[in-house]
Amino acid sequence: MAGHSKWANIKHRKGAQDALKAKIFNKFSKEIMVAVAKGGSDPNSNPALRLIISKARAKSMPKSNIEKAIAKGEGSTSNGENFKEIIYSGTLSHGISVIVVILTDNINRAIASLQALFRRANGQIGKQNSIPYLFEQKGYLEIEKNNLDEDDLMLFCLDNGAEDFQSDGENYMIYCQPRKISELKNEIEKKFSPNFRAVEISYFPNEWVELDQENTEKILNQIDNFLDDEDIQNVYHNLKFA
C-alpha cells in the first residue's frame, strides 16, 4: 500500500507539472501567433517574435510547438483567430498592487472574468491600459551560473547596455531597458553561450509590500486563480515574499 501511495503521489505531481507546462506553452503559443500576425513569421526581421521564441525556449517549449504557433499565426487573420492584448491595473487586499496582462480573442469574456476574479479576491479593478507609478517596465535576463565567471559576465553586460546585474545561489539576473533586451541577449549568447532560464520584458515594482505568512499565501493563491484564467497571460505584483 505504501508503494502504491508513493506512486499515486508521483503520478499526481507529474500530472500537475504536465498541466502547468501545457498552460505555459499555450500562453507562449498565443504570444507567438500575435507577433507573427503583426510582424511576419521571420524572427530575423521580427524582433518581437524573436524575443518570444527566446522566452519559450528558455522554458523548454518544444521546437514543434513553436513552429505550429508560427504557422497558426500566419493563418490567424483568415481563420478569425485574432488575439488582442489589454492591460489592467488593480489592487488586492492589504494594499497589494497588480498589473494583469490579457491576451484574448473575446474581450467581453475576458473583462467579465477579470471583474469576477477581482470581486472574489476582495480587490478593486483599475483602469484599462493604465500602469501605476509603482511599477517600471524592464528587460530581464536570467542565466544559469554553471562555470561562468561572474566578473567577466557582469562587466560584459554593463558594457553592452545592462543597467543592473545581480546573482543568487544558482543564477545571474540582468536588467536592461526593454528596447535593449534582444540586442543584449544576442551579444551574451555570442560571447558566452549560456543557458538562459528567462528572457522577458516584465513590470517590476518600485515599492514592495511585505505580509505575514498566512496573508502572503492567501494573496499568492488569489494570483494563481488569475493565472488559471485562459485569457490572462501574466500577473505582476508588489508582494514581497521569501
UniProtKB/Swiss-Prot annotation:
GO cellular component annotations of the record: cytosol
InterPro entries, A to Z: Integrase-like_N, TACO1_YebC-like_2nd/3rd_dom, TACO1_YebC_N, Transcrip_reg_TACO1-like, Transcrip_reg_TACO1-like_dom3, YebC-like
Domain of life (superkingdom): Bacteria
Gene3D superfamilies xrefs: 1.10.10.200, 3.30.70.980
Compartments, as annotated in UniProt: Cytoplasm
Keywords in alphabetical order: Cytoplasm, DNA-binding, Transcription, Transcription regulation
One Pfam entry name: TACO1_YebC_N
GO biological process: regulation of DNA-templated transcription
Location, primary (coarse class): cytoplasm
GO molecular function: DNA binding
Family membership: Belongs to the TACO1 family.
PANTHER family: TRANSCRIPTIONAL REGULATORY PROTEIN YEBC-RELATED (PTHR12532:SF6), TRANSLATIONAL ACTIVATOR OF CYTOCHROME C OXIDASE 1 (PTHR12532)
Protein name (database record): Probable transcriptional regulatory protein MHP7448_0474
